[in-house]
Amino acid sequence: MPLTPADVHNVAFSKPPIGKRGYNEDEVDAFLDLVENELTRLIEENSDLRQRINELDQELAAGGGAGVTPQATQAIPAYEPEPGKPAPAAVSAGMNEEQALKAARVLSLAQDTADRLTNTAKAESDKMLADARANAEQILGEARHTADATVAEARQRADAMLADAQSRSEAQLRQAQEKADALQADAERKHSEIMGTINQQRAVLEGRLEQLRTFEREYRTRLKTYLESQLEELGQRGSAAPVDSNADAGGFDQFNRGKN
């Protein structure tokens, strides 16, 4: 069945399943428009050639009489995607040999021109399709390369940020530990100093307490001795003898001076 521009214009493609690769719709539409225009041009050229051949056949028929066979006057078939080359039309024995050769050359030239145009259009179509596929592959490759580079760069940045955060965390922990050690050492030093001062003060207080105890013992001993001496003196004087208060006061003062 011949391919017409209307067939190209009305063709519809189904979308590929999800996850399958497909061509860009705009590029496909542009290519189909180009094919439609080229096919229209080829059909018009083919029609012009057939009209020209009909005119030549009429001229041959008018010049050579009725001896021209129907094959010589038959127009070439309508344009098809892959037409075959028909054999040159046969001429009757009464046709002029030069006119017959001329008609055969015209038919052959028309067919060759149609074949050449068809092959050229097909070659250009194949080339454009190959270029589109190559361009799509290149774009896809560049996109994959860019995606891989972006992922690698993001991974490197994440690793760098993680390493930096870990380094800062370790530095802060180290500084906190050093500060804690310094505070503990300072607290231990102050504790040692305070305990040393307390021990010194306790030793001084214990020494003074011992002095007070010694003084108390001496004071008690002297007081006892003094009282015993006074009692003994009173016993010797007798109960009738008056007590000399001045003597007692002087003796007590002497006791206190001896104590001091």
Swiss-Prot record:
<keyword id="KW-0175">Coiled coil</keyword>
<keyword id="KW-0132">Cell division</keyword>
<dbReference type="InterPro" id="IPR019933">
    <property type="entry name" value="DivIVA_domain"/>
</dbReference>
<dbReference type="InterPro" id="IPR007793">
    <property type="entry name" value="DivIVA_fam"/>
</dbReference>
<dbReference type="GO" id="GO:0040009">
    <property type="term" value="P:regulation of growth rate"/>
</dbReference>
<feature type="coiled-coil region">
    <location>
        <begin position="161"/>
        <end position="196"/>
    </location>
</feature>
<keyword id="KW-0597">Phosphoprotein</keyword>
<feature type="region of interest" description="Disordered">
    <location>
        <begin position="233"/>
        <end position="260"/>
    </location>
</feature>
<dbReference type="GO" id="GO:0050821">
    <property type="term" value="P:protein stabilization"/>
</dbReference>
<dbReference type="GO" id="GO:0051301">
    <property type="term" value="P:cell division"/>
</dbReference>
<comment type="function">
    <text>Important for maintaining cell shape and cell wall integrity by localizing peptidoglycan synthesis to the cell poles. Protects PbpB (PBP3, FtsI) from oxidative stress-induced cleavage.</text>
</comment>
<comment type="subunit">
    <text>Forms homooligomers. Interacts with PbpB and CwsA.</text>
</comment>
<dbReference type="Pfam" id="PF05103">
    <property type="entry name" value="DivIVA"/>
</dbReference>
<dbReference type="GO" id="GO:0009273">
    <property type="term" value="P:peptidoglycan-based cell wall biogenesis"/>
</dbReference>
<comment type="similarity">
    <text>Belongs to the DivIVA family.</text>
</comment>
<dbReference type="GO" id="GO:0009274">
    <property type="term" value="C:peptidoglycan-based cell wall"/>
</dbReference>
<keyword id="KW-0346">Stress response</keyword>
<keyword id="KW-0133">Cell shape</keyword>
<dbReference type="GO" id="GO:0008360">
    <property type="term" value="P:regulation of cell shape"/>
</dbReference>
<dbReference type="GO" id="GO:0005737">
    <property type="term" value="C:cytoplasm"/>
</dbReference>
<feature type="modified residue" description="Phosphothreonine">
    <location>
        <position position="73"/>
    </location>
</feature>
<keyword id="KW-0131">Cell cycle</keyword>
<keyword id="KW-0963">Cytoplasm</keyword>
<feature type="coiled-coil region">
    <location>
        <begin position="31"/>
        <end position="64"/>
    </location>
</feature>
<dbReference type="GO" id="GO:0005886">
    <property type="term" value="C:plasma membrane"/>
</dbReference>
<protein>
    <recommendedName>
        <fullName>Cell wall synthesis protein Wag31</fullName>
    </recommendedName>
</protein>
<dbReference type="GO" id="GO:0060187">
    <property type="term" value="C:cell pole"/>
</dbReference>
